[in-house]
Amino acid sequence: MKVRASVKKLCRNCKIVKREGVIRVICSAEPKHKQRQG
């Protein structure tokens, strides 16, 4: 999980979701693409 100021989709499988007020990127194809804004 990367913590970044600006989260971006890194591939076409990445999805941006908002959970409990935190913006996250989840990716089914590449788990290394997981990010959250912080």
From Swiss-Prot:
One of its GO terms (molecular function) is structural constituent of ribosome. One of its GO terms (biological process) is translation. Signal peptide: none annotated. It comes from the Bacteria. GO terms for cellular component: cytoplasm; ribonucleoprotein complex; ribosome. Keywords: Ribonucleoprotein, Ribosomal protein. Pfam families: Ribosomal_L36. Belongs to the bacterial ribosomal protein bL36 family. This is Large ribosomal subunit protein bL36A. The lineage of its organism: Bacteria, Pseudomonadati, Pseudomonadota, Gammaproteobacteria, Enterobacterales.
